[in-house]
Amino acid sequence: MENERITWVECPRDAMQGVVRFYPTEAKVRYLKQLMHCGFDVIDIGSFVSPKVIPQMADSAEVIRQLSPHKKGNKFLVICANKRGVDEAIDHPGVDIIGFPFSLSETFQ
């Protein structure tokens, strides 16, 4: 099978959310700008989830707000674990794609 188009996706959110020490918003923005300039089609940039559960993602809305003016064809993907997160993501003009983690395992999430 031949692909006419491959979408290049980077997922820094997955790595960042597991880091215990909170990275400053400015550091995230600097790093993500570099990824944007690499030419990724989609960047999994943050999560609209409870900051009690994943504190590293508490600033996702601000990160996206700061990065949106610099988009050059990139699309921003965010993860939402519930309806509240989806509602917040839908209201954010910088969000292009919403991912919802669905698991068949009772021990995951």
Model-assigned labels for residue ranges:
Residues 81-93:
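Catalytic cores of alpha/beta
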Residues 11-13, 48-50, 79-84, 103-105:
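Active-site beta-loop-alpha junctions enriched in small/polar residues
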Residues 1-20, 97-109:
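N-terminal small/glycine-rich loop or linker at the start of catalytic domains
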Residues 30-46, 90-98:
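Catalytic domains of carbohydrate-active enzymes, especially glycoside hydrolases
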Residues 29-33, 60-64, 86:
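Generic structural signal for well-ordered alpha-helices
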Residues 20-21, 46, 52, 78:
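Glycine- and other small-residue-rich loops at beta-strand/loop junctions that grip anionic moieties
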Residues 41-67, 100-109:
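Glycine-rich, proline-tolerant flexible connector loops at the mouths of alpha/beta enzymes
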Residues 2-6, 39-41, 69-76, 94-96:
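Short, well-ordered coil/turn segments that N-cap beta-strands
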